[in-house]
């Protein structure tokens, strides 16, 4: 399989790696179709930021959100079958093996790969509502309109926010937030 490895700042290489041939009973093997960048973290890794969580030294793998097709399943796997489209939190690699119990989820029919690939990041946005003990009917202010902030804006109506106020410094991102029902406030 091939995997994107960040060797040093501004230097990504595609490496060939061997996956084990035999699966454990609770593992699946899948082939990646689409992989998404984690925009802030991957950019920080690429630019050599010192404070990227979980990545203290080089080489670093990048990415943690991909869409794949299940190619093979272990003898005890019950949730997935060969041919299933799944979303996972694996790095940018062409093929992977993971335990059935890890963060892997079947993608419903009708959901495009390009939309589903963001779902792992949007779960972080949704978690903000849980962590804040949000109560439906309250107002929400989202400060920062990166991918996680825009996800939090999109989650406002789903969680029952009365109003969602989006605070950012980009006209483009404020427009995106507005399309999701927020009232943008732009700092320049």
Show which residues each predicted segment covers.
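NAD(P)H dinucleotide-binding glycine-rich loop of Rossmann-like/cofactor-binding domains
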Residues: 59-67, 71, 79-143
């Amino acid at each position: 399989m091939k995997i994107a490895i960040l060797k040093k700042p501004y230097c990504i290489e595609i490496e060939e790696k061997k996956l084990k041939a035999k699966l454990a009973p609770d593992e699946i093997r899948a082939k990646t179709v689409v992989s998404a960048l984690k925009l802030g973290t991957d950019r920080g890794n690429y630019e050599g930021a010192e404070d990227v969580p979980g990545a203290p030294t080089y080489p670093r793998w990048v990415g943690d959100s991909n869409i794949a097709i299940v190619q093979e399943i272990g003898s005890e796997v019950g949730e997935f079958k060969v041919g299933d489209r799944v979303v996972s939190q694996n790095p940018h690699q062409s093929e992977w093996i993971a335990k059935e119990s890890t963060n892997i989820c079947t993608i419903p029919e009708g959901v495009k790969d390009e939309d589903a690939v963001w779902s792992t990041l949007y779960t972080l946005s949704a978690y903000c509502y849980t962590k804040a003990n949000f109560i439906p009917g309250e107002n929400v202010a989202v400060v920062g309109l990166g991918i996680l902030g825009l996800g939090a804006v999109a989650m406002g109506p789903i969680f029952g926010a009365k109003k969602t106020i989006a605070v950012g410094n980009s006209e483009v991102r404020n427009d995106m937030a507005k399309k999701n029902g927020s009232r943008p406030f732009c700092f320049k």
